[in-house]
Amino acid sequence: LSFAIRDLNASGGLVISASHNPPDDNGSKFYHGHGGQFVPPHDQTLADTIAEVERVERMPFDRGVSTGLIREISESVHVNYIAANIAAVSPPARPWIPVVFTPLHGTAHTSVGDVLEAAGVPVTAQPEQSVPDGRFPTVPFKSPNPESAEALDLAIQTAQENGIDLVMGCDPDAD
């Protein structure tokens, strides 16, 4: 989202995510036009503005699309994201080492995973955890935190089965 905001010259963006927490902990992350999250004192200004909202009007999705309030983001943003990340990395002096990658049921497979593959990194995706699923069915305690060894158990198993020495994981919202 941070890249898309800048690429589309948007005023900001919103992610609804439990991040690396259990599914019941969904929350909102607001991003400013520069692509970063709101920080003090702007975060308080945003919170105060949200607190003043008395009601939220709803409309059918199709109507939102037909009125221009909702628009699909083209594949070009994804292509630009990959190109920008590849351009920021110097080619390695030696071949990349193979890696097992897990997005822990989140969106990182189409961001981090695609960038790794485009860079030429030999990537083996952890298959069960590459399927987006906000219930996090394969993660102990339903807490997909890549800093938790238990969350990476399946990826480690995949690495051992494939003779790979490196495991990489991202939290579900890939931030």
PLM features: residue spans?
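A generic local secondary-structure boundary/capping motif
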Residues: 2-5, 17, 89, 155-156, ...
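Gly/Ser/Thr-enriched, mixed-charge loops and adjacent short helices
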Residues: 26-159
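Generic detector of short, well-ordered, non-transmembrane alpha-helical segments enriched
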Residues: 42, 164-165
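Ferredoxin-reductase
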Residues: 1-34
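Glycine-rich phosphate-binding loop signature in dinucleotide/nucleotide-binding domains
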Residues: 8-9, 159-164
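Structural motif
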Residues: 11-14, 29, 123-124, 165-167, ...
